[in-house]
Each structure stands twice: as C-alpha cells, then as structure tokens.
C-alpha cells in the first residue's frame, strides 16, 4: 500500500460521511479533511461578527481573515479558527442551520476549494463534503457517494445532538435536513451531485463498520491495480 491515493466521500447532510471518512483515514494512516467543518467555521466566524450571511462581499471579508487548521486529537479531529479550538461550537444547531446559506456563495466556495485542493495535493487524503468528487478532487482514485433516507439521517443527527447535550426535536430535524438537501442540490455553484464515476452507497440499513468495510474493499481494489 505504498501508493498514496485521494479518496472523495460525498453525500447529503447527516449521511454519516464524516464518521466513516475518519475511520477510513485512520485505517490507511491518511489525513482526514472535513470540508464541512471548513464551511461551518466560516459560518461560525460570520455569526460571531454579526455579518449578514446573505451578503457575499461581507462574507468574503470574514473569509480573508480566517485561518482554519486541523489537528488530530486523541479520538477526534480538532478544528481551529485563528488558533482557537472551535470543534464543538461549529456543531451547534445555530451554525448547522445556516451553513448551506454560506456555502452557496460562489466566491466563498472558490476560496474554500482552493484551500482544500492545496491540502490534498500530495495525496494520502480522505476528504468528505458535497462536491469533492465532482469539483474539489475530480481526479480522486476512489469516489463514494453516500446516501440514506431523510428519516434515518434525522434519527442519527437527533442521537448526535442528544449525546452532545443540545436540544433536539426529531420532526424539526427531518424538516431541516430536507431543506438542506434542497438548498445543497439546487444551488448554482457546485451543487450536491453524484460524480459520474462515483460508487453509490446507501447506508440506511448499514452500520458504520459495514460501510467502512465496503469502502476499504473498494480501496483495496484500487491498490491491487
């Protein structure tokens, strides 16, 4: 396994991309890049600065002054905004419900994609998001598109929220996830879309271990070539 490849994992909100991507990266001793966390960090910074997130010009001022870094913690990846650990605060419902609005802006996405490509240029990365296989890493050797029903994804997010001590309403989550799907797939710039050469993986009735196993066997096939 000397060959260091790029692995792109795309899919809608709460499909389990990050959880699976982290495990795959760990198994391969690869770098995991959570592109969603990058957009969340920008969203958090904009909200903190009371910026109008519909205003692209104002958002770009925030982006220019934001340095995002990833560090491997004991059991998880830590996200830093200008040196401050924001790993937890970027996962609050307040940020979650606004991140698709921030991510729809062309200039914001262009800058984020530039940074993501820079992080991945040497290979040996597992990157997850909405447009990795289609736009960020179109030449990735492995492309996965993860799917799950809205109900299943809402259940997962509900459990995640409860475990983190956030207030959580399952029915409201179903509505919010459906709304994010709509925003993500209908936006003009890099919409949520399966790459033509991506393998579709419906995770609705699969455990994390089963999904990881499927991806690892796909990766093994690439290494064997």
Curated annotation (Swiss-Prot):
Its EC number is 2.7.4.25. GO terms for molecular function: ATP binding; CMP kinase activity; dCMP kinase activity. One of its GO terms (biological process) is nucleobase-containing small molecule interconversion. ATP binds at residues 11-19. It catalyses: CMP + ATP = CDP + ADP; dCMP + ATP = dCDP + ADP. This is Cytidylate kinase. It comes from Bacillus cereus (strain ATCC 10987 / NRS 248). The keyword rRNA-binding does not apply. CDD domains: CMPK.
């Amino acid at each position: 396994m000397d060959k260091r490849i790029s692995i792109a994992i795309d899919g809608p909100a709460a499909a389990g991309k990050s959880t699976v991507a982290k495990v795959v990266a760990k198994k391969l001793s690869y770098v995991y890049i959570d592109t969603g966390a990058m957009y969340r960090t920008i969203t958090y910074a904009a909200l903190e600065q009371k910026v109008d997130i519909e205003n692209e010009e104002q958002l770009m001022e925030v982006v220019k002054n934001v340095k995002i870094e990833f560090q491997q913690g004991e059991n998880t990846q830590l996200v830093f905004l200008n040196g401050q650990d924001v790993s937890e605060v970027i996962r609050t419902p307040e940020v979650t419900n606004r991140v698709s609005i921030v991510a729809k802006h062309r200039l914001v996405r262009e800058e984020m994609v530039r940074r993501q490509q820079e992080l991945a240029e040497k290979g040996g990365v597992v990157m997850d998001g909405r447009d990795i296989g289609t736009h960020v890493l179109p030449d990735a050797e492995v492309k996965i598109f993860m799917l799950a029903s809205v109900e299943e994804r809402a259940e997962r997010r509900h459990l995640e929220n409860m475990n983190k001590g956030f207030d959580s309403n399952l029915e409201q989550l179903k509505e919010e996830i459906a709304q994010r799907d709509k925003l993500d797939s209908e936006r003009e710039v890099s919409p949520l879309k399966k790459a033509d050469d991506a393998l579709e993986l419906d995770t609705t009735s699969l455990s994390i271990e089963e999904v990881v196993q499927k991806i690892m066997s796909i990766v093994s096939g690439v290494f064997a070539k």
